[in-house]
Amino acid sequence: MKASKNYKFWFATGSQDLYGDECLRKVAEHSRIIVEELNKSGVLPYEVVLKPTLITNEVIRRTFNEANEDEECAGVITWMHTFSPAKSWILGLQEYRKPLLHLHTQFNQEIPYDTIDMDFMNENQSAHGDRAVSYTHLRAHETAANL
């Protein structure tokens, strides 16, 4: 009987440094919590591995190319915690050749309507970032399919 490989899924969170280091620390913490919960759930066939927050096109491209080269990487899960400029993802996505799952959701289950402020808004712009990057995923896939 052939033994299956010990694959891993990479979890890559998109953001930007526009809102400062404190916001990026929260982004990293929220990403860590999501990865822990995914791994605890037992519903995925392989472990999810947290990658550093992706905030520049160079880091995004390098991360996707490292995923391409890593034989244990079964695919990448992306999530846009805060607004991540879609143009930063273009080259990395065009070069990426493995399965991709885009997690299109906010971190918080509930929106704190009574206490919401601009800090909360700036730290939780998944909807905007997800839409922009999802469109980029589509365009990169169309480009790759037409090669």
Where do the model's predicted regions map?
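Conserved small/polar residues in nucleotide/adenosyl-binding loops
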Residues: 136-143
